Amino acid sequence: MIAIFKREIRNYLKRPLFWVGVLLVIYGVFNATSPYLTTHYLTTGEKIINDQSNTSVEGEVYEGYIPATPEKHREVWHEKVKIKLTDVFGLTDSEAQNVIEKLESMNLKEAYAYLEQEYDWYGARYLYEDSTYYKGTAEEINAYLDKKLEDKTFSFYYARKFADFAGLYMVFFAIIMLAVLFLQDTKKHTYELLHTKPVTAGKYVMGKVSAGFTICLLVLTILNILFWVLCRIYTKDSGFEVRLWDFVASTVLYILPNMLMIVSIYTLISLIFKNPLPGVPLLILYMVYSNLGGTNAEGVYGYWGKPLAIMVRFPGQLFDTTPPPMACLL
């Protein structure tokens, strides 16, 4: 088995396709996560300038957005409702203010019903959702960062985004590279192997599986070290705490099990069909299944995770990510 393991590792490392794949994974992950590395404390009076609206249904701190508290959320919504009443429904400023004063004494459901009944306006609830995040002042953004980083490191949050996109790109990488590896089992390769070392079928399969998993582990090691260094470089002026362990923990919890599953599936398919190529479309479909959104018990659509998925995604904002339900089943 050792001879098979060493041969497969050499076959990987000597192929230019392998290193091209590694570079593409690095580029993809960096391109997707580098904006989060621009997060920083703001100086007094500093503003994050962009052409985005002052409120949004979702937004990142590096864009200047912070989540609104229930009180702030309601305050921002009232301001937008007042503007809508004057600009669209033709109310005067004093009339719109009277409506706002009535809404302040109602809960959200009552406020929605009032606006629907009095003004035939059914979009007020969507205006409320669009006020979930707002552009904060420098003091508000800094206070939000202090709160989020009080008990956890910056790398704890960033490592989850790293695991999100590294897991996605590593699935593509593993699907292609493992197909190439298993395709090497031509008659010529097998003939040479069987006439140089005594080998059983079990040892041969274990050698292939362990080599495939080890090569994925090697790539993930490179990614962990590289992005840990990048995270330290980008955030050195912000004073954020960055730990290598956060990257390792996210990789072990959310990526390594998926790599082992992909290698095992490829091995099983290769044994059944005597060819690894049928595994490519099957694994791509498996990846699509793992990445599909869904509706929870409350009817809210989003990414909730699926049993035996080969990817764990963290689609929320940087400081609001949580492992999806059923991630423990992966």
State where each predicted segment sits:
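Hydrophobic alpha-helical transmembrane segments
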Residues: F5, F18-V22, V248-L253, V280-L282, ...
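Transmembrane alpha-helix boundary/hinge residues in polytopic small-molecule transporters
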Residues: H189-T190, S264, V280
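Terminal transmembrane helical anchor/hairpin motif
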Residues: P35-K80, D146-F154, L277-L330
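Aromatic- and glycine-rich beta-strand/loop motifs that create alpha-glucan
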Residues: M1-V25
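Secretory targeting signals
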Residues: L24-K72, A113, Y122-I176, M206-P276
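Membrane-anchoring hydrophobic segments
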Residues: F154-R160, D185, E192-L194, Y301
